[in-house]
A protein has these predicted regions:
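Extended, histidine- and acidic-residue-enriched regions that form the cofactor-binding/catalytic faces
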Residues: 1-81, 85-102, 110-234
Length: 234
């Protein structure tokens, strides 16, 4: 067997090769007229890839399906069990072919948050240490709002001609999850976001977008460091 030069390149600790970073977003859901339907997947992928570049960890790509709570219907999603099974299969393959032993999941879609209840099952089925990072969801604000618009500006995926129509909530009620009254009733955070969009509208600020992305990337880098420290004695 060939001996790999695990210290080659800009690698601070060769154990980082045992860590994978995978993006988890949503490819098929509406975000208003200014943002593509795969906004969450692209933002999560960017964060995961940049963190992999900076840390030296393995970039494992992006998971295809996504989950959503039943009160919200703005796209095509799968059950939590189906999402769990997909993640398990992808991570088993990564473990087999790349020899990883831990993973950071970079989640960019709020509907995937219930996956936290399945992390123990995923660890048991894969034999991997799993960290779920949802920092960007905690930081970006309402669905299709200024945070996502500003990050989309940085990534070059925004249609700026349509920003003026982003808050036409009679036509694009998914923005801020405004149209989903049951979800707003059940979740104060969703209600707050919907009211913010209705009352304050949206804006695009490239500096803000960069700040959000850097905050999320640094959070993932910290998770990688924690895995190195706890799992590999770094």
């Amino acid at each position: 067997m060939v001996e790999l030069r695990v210290n080659a390149g800009n690698v601070k600790n060769p154990n980082v090769h045992k860590i994978g970073i995978i993006a988890l977003g949503s490819h098929l859901e509406n975000h208003g007229p200014a943002l593509p339907i795969d906004t969450d997947a692209k933002i999560a992928s960017y964060i995961a890839f940049r963190a992999a570049l900076e840390s030296g960890a393995k970039f494992l790509g992006v998971s295809y399906p996504a989950h959503e709570i039943k009160e919200i219907n703005h796209g095509i999603h799968v059950s939590l069990d189906d999402l769990t099974n997909e993640i398990v299969n992808v991570l088993k393959s990564a473990k087999k072919h790349l020899g990883i032993s831990s993973v950071v999941i970079v989640n960019g879609h709020g509907g995937n948050l219930p996956i936290v209840t399945k992390l123990y099952d995923i660890e048991e089925q894969t034999g991997l240490l799993i960290t779920l990072n949802s920092k960007i969801i905690e930081s970006e604000g309402p669905h299709g709002g200024s945070g996502e618009l500003s990050m989309a500006k940085v990534l070059g995926i925004i249609n700026e001609d349509e920003v003026k129509n982003q808050t036409d909530l009679s036509e694009y009620g998914e923005v801020g999850l405004f149209m989903f009254s049951e979800a707003r009733k059940n979740d104060p955070n969703i209600e707050e976001g919907a009211m913010d969009i209705e009352e304050n509208g949206v804006y695009v600020d490239e500096v803000y977008g960069n700040e959000l992305l850097k905050l999320a990337i640094n959070s993932v880098l910290l998770d990688v460091e924690k895995q190195l420290d706890s799992h590999y004695g770094y």
